[in-house]
Amino acid sequence: MDSNTVSSFQVDCFLWHVRKRFADQELGDAPFLDRLRRDQKSLRGRGSTLGLDIETATRAGKQIMERILEEESDEALKMTIASVPASRYLTDMTLEEMSRDWFMLMPKQKVAGSLCIRIDQAIMDKNIILKANFSVIFDRLETLILLRAFTEEGAIVGEISPLPSLPGHTDEDVKNAIGVLIGGLEWNDNTVRVSETLQRFAWRSSNEDGRPPLPPKQKRKMARTIESEV
């Protein structure tokens, strides 16, 4: 196993522990707590994949960070902060909408790269909106936290979420996954639109009907994909 992979996991475990202590003092806002919960799942998945104990890794990560901080000067810290572009966290969904449990009458699931797509194919003839919470950097979607499909009544009928054991995805991965989700929902004569925020940063465009610019050929392909492969 690559030593950098192990040490990266150890540092991530320790930094999560620090953030958890911060949250335990009721100092974190909603986006902070949301990322904390998501990162916990990711660490568990990575730990299982690597065969590493999280508690042991956290202690090792603490030692690594202590060595780094001993050598860190205030001037170096200022330069590092200035050179790192800042990302923004955008929310279409409330914390309740993100954490709410939901159930599918006709569950369908597809894994696309590091993203998991889930659809309730019992849903027909509904108006559906896709909402997402995600981070943005350089005015482009950076990391998807969670995307969910809602009916006008507020019921959850679809979802795209990162797989904890396979961290890392691009904005193109997200757009392709959204295409699969839309195709699956439209296969049952549902009308799907995407939130304006998601359109703006995933496609850098906004349509009046809330429809991302997927060509008809891709739409038919996505519908067949969700029908045959899920």
UniProtKB/Swiss-Prot annotation:
Motif (Nuclear export signal): 137-146
Residue positions of motif Nuclear localization signal: 34-38
Any single GO CC term annotated in Swiss-Prot or TrEMBL for this entry: host cell cytoplasm
Annotated region described as RNA-binding and homodimerization, given as residue ranges: 1-73
GO biological process per UniProt: symbiont-mediated suppression of host cytoplasmic pattern recognition receptor signaling pathway via inhibition of RIG-I activity; symbiont-mediated suppression of host gene expression; symbiont-mediated suppression of host mRNA processing; symbiont-mediated suppression of host PKR/eIFalpha signaling; symbiont-mediated suppression of host type I interferon-mediated signaling pathway
PABPN1-binding: annotated span: 223-230
Keywords of the record: Eukaryotic host gene expression shutoff by virus, Host cytoplasm, Host gene expression shutoff by virus, Host mRNA suppression by virus, Host nucleus, Host-virus interaction, Inhibition of host innate immune response by virus, Inhibition of host interferon signaling pathway by virus, Inhibition of host PKR by virus, Inhibition of host pre-mRNA processing by virus, Inhibition of host RIG-I by virus, Inhibition of host RLR pathway by virus, Interferon antiviral system evasion, RNA-binding, Ubl conjugation, Viral immunoevasion
Family under the similarity heading: Belongs to the influenza A viruses NS1 family.
Lineage: Viruses, Riboviria, Orthornavirae, Negarnaviricota, Polyploviricotina
Compartment(s) where it occurs, according to its Swiss-Prot or TrEMBL record: Host nucleus; Host cytoplasm
InterPro entries from the UniProt entry: NS1 (IPR004208), NS1A (IPR000256), NS1A_effect_dom-like_sf (IPR038064), uS15_NS1_RNA-bd_sf (IPR009068)
Described function: Inhibits post-transcriptional processing of cellular pre-mRNA, by binding and inhibiting two cellular proteins that are required for the 3'-end processing of cellular pre-mRNAs: the 30 kDa cleavage and polyadenylation specificity factor/CPSF4 and the poly(A)-binding protein 2/PABPN1. In turn, unprocessed 3' end pre-mRNAs accumulate in the host nucleus and are no longer exported to the cytoplasm. Cellular protein synthesis is thereby shut off very early after virus infection.
Source domain of life: Viruses
Matches recorded under HAMAP family: INFV_NS1
Region (CPSF4-binding): 180-215
Post-translational modification: Upon interferon induction, ISGylated via host HERC5; this results in the impairment of NS1 interaction with RNA targets due to its inability to form homodimers and to interact with host EIF2AK2/PKR.
The record's note on its domains: The dsRNA-binding region is required for suppression of RNA silencing.
Main location: host cell
Organism of provenance: Influenza A virus (strain A/Mallard/Ohio/556/1987 H5N9)
Disordered: region residues: 205-230
Gene name of this polypeptide: NS
Protein name: Non-structural protein 1
